[in-house]
């Protein structure tokens, strides 16, 4: 499913291609690209749930309103998000790329993924997808994009 999400993000969203694509055509394009129907269905469902945040139909769980509070992760969250992922989320909060709400959206979307392996690079892409879809997060999205791509470019020098 995560491969389908990455393909969709890079092909349709990140490239600013036509965003209004017929779902049947999209499913056919994904099938033609070699993705399994179940993965396609799960990815589209994942994106629907993300769109619920955008449309105000869903809100992230509010655990604390004090910005100085520390997020304690559940065992399930710790299993999916290793120490480097949790540290990266904290770093993004400290530099104000994520706020309490967007952090919870990211965590919820990570837990909704069905892949067994989940790494820091995967988290970065989920963060980009969440920030891209949330109104008012354009600056945070741009900062995250710069962080993601500058780090990779810096490695080439």
UniProtKB/Swiss-Prot annotation:
Family membership: Belongs to the Smg family.
Organism: Escherichia coli (strain K12)
Record's protein name: Protein Smg
Pfam families, alphabetized: DUF494
Lineage of origin: Bacteria, Pseudomonadati, Pseudomonadota, Gammaproteobacteria, Enterobacterales
Coiled coil: none
InterPro entries the record matches: Smg
Superkingdom classification of source: Bacteria
